[in-house]
Curated annotation (Swiss-Prot):
Source organism per UniProt: Gloeobacter violaceus (strain ATCC 29082 / PCC 7421)
SUPFAM superfamilies: Ribosomal protein S18
GO MF term list: small ribosomal subunit rRNA binding; structural constituent of ribosome
Keywords in alphabetical order: Ribonucleoprotein, Ribosomal protein, RNA-binding, rRNA-binding
UniProt protein name: Small ribosomal subunit protein bS18
Record's keyword annotation contains Cytoplasm: no
Domain of life: Bacteria
Subunit structure of this chain's protein: Part of the 30S ribosomal subunit. Forms a tight heterodimer with protein bS6.
HAMAP family from the UniProt entry: Ribosomal_bS18
Cellular component GO terms, alphabetical: cytosolic small ribosomal subunit
Length: 74
């Protein structure tokens, strides 16, 4: 028998003890769409606190011109 709706424990892509820093641009780019939008938590798999910290870091990096607000390549 299969149990529908059971997914098991989700593993966060970033270890919980690691700090999310606005200077780690390569890490932040993994959580942004091609158009520059921040991916939602249900897609990233982060914890609630990590998602909040990620959002703050991305917004801070945008203000310091490390990341673009909108990617207009396409």
């Amino acid at each position: 028998m299969t149990s529908f709706g059971y997914r098991g424990k989700r593993v966060s892509p970033i270890p919980p003890k690691d700090k999310i820093d606005y200077k780690e641009v390569d890490l932040l780019r993994k959580f942004i769409t091609e158009r520059g939008k921040i991916l939602p938590r249900r897609i990233t798999g982060l914890t609630a606190k990590q998602q909040r910290d990620l959002t703050v870091a991305i917004k801070r990096a945008r203000l310091l011109a490390l990341l673009p607000f909108v990617n207009q390549e396409g």
